[in-house]
A protein has these predicted regions:
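A membrane-topology feature that recognizes alpha-helical transmembrane segments
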Residues: 1-276
């Protein structure tokens, strides 16, 4: 049964990921989410069987069904990312010998699906535009704050416990975690760090608490530094410029930090990873 739950969650992630990609692409563009998707090359309205980029990419061998133009692999990132996120969220109990098929666990899992759906949209949007929309950070922050009244980490697993009074640590986590970075923004007048990242950390603090929240920040810096160093080494060895942004390589342009924060939040939550 545990394996079935993980498989269902992963498939659900593939399906929802397609929608989240549309949300990220159309966010702040004035386009309605109700409108049908179109081929970026020929403008042909896509049928229902073309609305899942991963399957379309594999079945059509990377080409549009109508004009045979190449389908950008960027379109499948959201599906793969969401599938991996949802699969890991559903599987988090396995790492601590917790039965997955129980009401409290499943309620928490569904709640985390909602939370990380918002975070994935932020992930994709920041990756493309290098900015975190305030409305998405606010939505995440509100849900994160609400979580401290209904969810807790029991035996290292995020689980539904029913309504309860949160501790002072839980209440202050949403302030404590982003505070140093907000001060850095204030002191540097935005030159060292943007304000979007501290806003995102408010929700992370409420969701994870102080200890796990601080751990997620450390892990995000490690992931970001490792990523940037890897790209630099590959560029140096092969004399190629990877991950270009216009005419600049990613090493010479602003590196979006929200994706690393979100990946670190997932890792910390799923594995209850404490580095301090």
């Amino acid at each position: 049964m545990d394996i079935l739950i993980i498989v269902i969650a992963t498939i659900l992630g593939l399906l929802i990921g397609s929608f989240l990609n549309v949300v990220a692409l159309r966010f702040n563009t004035g386009k309605s989410l109700n409108g049908r998707s179109e081929c970026f090359s020929c403008g042909h309205v896509l049928s229902w069987k073309d609305l899942f980029p991963l399957f379309s990419f594999l079945l059509q061998r990377g080409r549009c069904r109508y004009c045979s133009s190449s389908i950008s692999i960027d379109n499948i990132y959201a599906e793969v990312i969401t599938a991996v996120f949802f699969g890991l969220i559903a599987a988090r109990g396995i790492f601590f010998d917790v039965l997955l098929f129980n009401v409290e666990y499943l309620v928490a899992t569904l709640f985390l699906f909602v939370i990380f759906s918002i975070l994935i949209v932020i992930f994709l949007y920041d990756l493309k535009h290098k900015i975190i929309p305030d409305s998405l950070s606010l939505s995440f922050g509100i849900l994160g704050f609400g979580s401290i009244f209904f969810f807790e980490f029991i035996n290292k697993v995020f689980i539904y416990t029913g309504i309860h009074t949160p501790s002072w640590e839980q209440l202050l986590a949403g302030i404590f975690i982003p505070l140093p970075f907000a001060l850095l923004w204030l002191i540097s007048k935005g030159r060292w760090i943007g304000l979007g990242d501290p806003k995102l950390m408010v929700g992370i603090g409420f969701l994870l608490g102080i200890k796990l929240g601080v751990s997620s920040i450390f892990i995000s810096f490690w992931i970001g530094a490792s990523f940037a160093l890897s790209i630099y080494i590959i560029n140096f060895i092969f004399k190629k410029t990877l991950l270009q942004t216009g005419k600049k390589s990613i090493m010479k342009s602003e590196l979006p930090f929200a994706p690393f924060l979100i990946i670190a939040t997932l890792i910390t939550l799923v594995f209850n990873l404490q580095v301090i």
